[in-house]
Amino acid sequence: MKERINYYSDGLKLSGILSKPDNAKKGSNLPGVVLVPGFMSTADAFFPGFADEFTAAGFVSLTMDFRGFGESEGVRGEVIPYLQIYDASNAISYLQSRPEVNPDKIALLGVSLGGGEVAYIAARDRRVKAVASMVLVGDGERRMRRFRTEQEWATLMQKVQEDRINRVLTGKSKDFHGFLDKGTDSVLVMPPELTSSLKDAEQVEKEKGNKTTLATVDGWLDYKPEEIIDKVAPTPILFVQAEKDELEADDADRLYNKAKEPKKLFTLKGGVHFDVYGKRTDEAMKPVLEWFKQYLQ
């Protein structure tokens, strides 16, 4: 059973999709999971498969639209990780308010950018009883530098500095691309074969061509979950990495090595970054379900 819901974060009306077993009712006392999307993704793009897995396993899940995406209010397409972390924390509060949910059994699943954001939340919010981080981005600056030359990076930083001045004088950030296959006109650079496939992806179509703002680059510069990952303990954390992840490389290994127990690392053999979203969702979700059942049920 799926239900489109709304909740408020920082005064903005945000949207999400609540998924629950058909027999869920007031007093069911079911564990709940907040699903935290990746970069520029939405609740109804890629994530239904994750939610369906949780429903079948007896969980109530909330897949959120961050501010500025899907049906949520906010600056369209802008991705400021610390604000998204705030939105996800408020999603926990909403899930705790549901009569079907046990408020003391809440978990987080984050994918890609969301994979690092859930680490930030778990490090400071002990309402979270278990967390799973899938094909995560471990450091925003390191990811933005990937596939760029030093000169391209310097050019991008000059654009960011000019936009900082523009924002304080006009109140607006310049429009920018979320990702391109090269150059300095996007937040991220992706290999051409990935960029071409993403042009037809549902979430990009909904957001009209992966448009964001230059302020997003500034937000990513401050995003460094690798620096706080040791603070997640004693909350148990699972890392799911794709063996051939061409985007996030060894980020999961880095964070796993710095995290404290209880922790676990699962590798999707032969997998690439976007395999977890569809082709191999079932395989990637198996260790997540086992992890959450161990600590929540």
Predicted features by range, described:
Residues Y7, A43, F69-D104, Y277-G278, ...:
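Catalytic nucleophile-loop/oxyanion-hole region of alpha/beta-hydrolase
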Residues F39-D52, F66:
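The serine-hydrolase catalytic nucleophile loop
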Residues A107, A119-S196:
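Alpha/beta-hydrolase-fold enzymes
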Residues V232, F239-Q241:
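Short beta-strand/loop motif that positions the catalytic acidic residue
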Residues G271-F274, G278-Q297:
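Catalytic active-site module of serine/aspartate enzymes centered on a nucleophile-bearing elbow/loop
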